[in-house]
Amino acid sequence: METNTVLTFTQEEVDYIRSQRLARIATASKKGDPDVAPVGFDFDGTYFYVGGHILIRTIKYKNVLENPKVSFVIDDLASIKPWTPRSLKIRGTADLADRDNGYLGPAKYIRIKPTHKTTININRPFKYR
């Protein structure tokens, strides 16, 4: 991982993260070819972990080996009327980590260290205009 700075999350953000099971991870090859994939994830309060049943065969795995910069988005619709999207977008660096107790059991995971975050409708009430 690049830096020692730890990004912190508000209690509202942590509650939202823990209420969701699906996210999207965006990676890029060393040439800059982009890829985005829906993924399950774990959050330990500091890092996000992304696994897969055959992780080492995925584009995201290969891309992280070549280029550690990633984006990670957790989002949903809290309501349709009024229209209330919610999201937490993370930018950060990723590496590979072996975990004994991840959501898929003992395995290799992509570990994401958040360095920047942007939220919509999580830390304050949504006001429809």
How would you describe each model-predicted region?
Residues 1-22, 129:
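Extreme N-terminal tail/first-helix region
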Residues 17-18, 49, 109-114:
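A generic structural signal for ordered secondary structure
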Residues 21-55, 72:
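Short beta-strand segments
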Residues 5-7, 53, 95:
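Short gly/ser/thr-rich secondary-structure transition/capping motifs
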Residues 9-12, 36-37, 57-59:
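A generic local structural motif
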Residues 109-129:
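Flexible glycine-rich active-site/ligand-binding loops centered on an Asp-His dyad
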Residues 18-20, 33-34, 87, 103-105:
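Short solvent-exposed loop/turn micro-motifs enriched in small/polar/acidic residues
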Residues 55-116:
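Short, structured beta-strand-loop surface elements
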